[in-house]
């Protein structure tokens, strides 16, 4: 079986770390053990520096990061990760499990920020070509639930400090995109934890079995 790229998406506090652990456990039970893990923005030395610039509220002092500058920094970090880590790993037969990918930009910047969606799609295609995840697990949670969980973890980053309206727009765009793409599977992350974990296990198991069919 050819190696695959699985991405976990969702608002802050959706439970992406727990989901990643469940995905790994499920893949291992299915005999898949050669995996690497990525996060966006980040995952390479350069991409981590860009992560600090775009997320650390103190990194640029009083200077306001414009919406378009934010988008371009996300894409700079993304293409560096894709070209230097993800594609080489897949070519070597290693599965890649990612914490966020391009769907985040389409939802956060296209939905939350209200940036023109055609422009974002054009930029994505110019930077990434036809490269896409094989499977995306979107953990759907309301901003009220997600941000309560995120705030319980401690200090929030620059984007986590946005308004509920921002996150409602982001969630709406996530759901819209998920409805348009069969490779995106929506998981109700407001359920009890064990139910969420069971849904992830079932989704991943069925998907891998279909690959073997």
UniProtKB/Swiss-Prot annotation:
A single cellular component GO annotation: cytosol
GO molecular function: ATP binding; dTMP kinase activity
Binding-site positions, ATP: 10-17
Keywords assigned by UniProt, alphabetized: ATP-binding, Kinase, Nucleotide biosynthesis, Nucleotide-binding, Transferase
Reaction equation(s) it catalyzes: dTMP + ATP = dTDP + ADP
SUPFAM superfamilies: P-loop containing nucleoside triphosphate hydrolases
InterPro entries referenced in this protein's UniProt entry, alphabetically: P-loop_NTPase, Thymidylate_kin-like_dom, Thymidylate_kin_CS, Thymidylate_kinase
Top-level taxon in the UniProt lineage: Bacteria
CDD domains for the chain: TMPK
Enzyme Commission number: 2.7.4.9
Signal peptide boundaries: none
GO biological process, one term: dTDP biosynthetic process
Similarity comment: Belongs to the thymidylate kinase family.
PANTHER family the record matches: THYMIDYLATE KINASE, UMP-CMP KINASE 2, MITOCHONDRIAL
Summary of the function given for this chain in its UniProt record: Phosphorylation of dTMP to form dTDP in both de novo and salvage pathways of dTTP synthesis.
Name of the protein this chain belongs to: Thymidylate kinase
Source organism (scientific name): Escherichia coli (strain SMS-3-5 / SECEC)
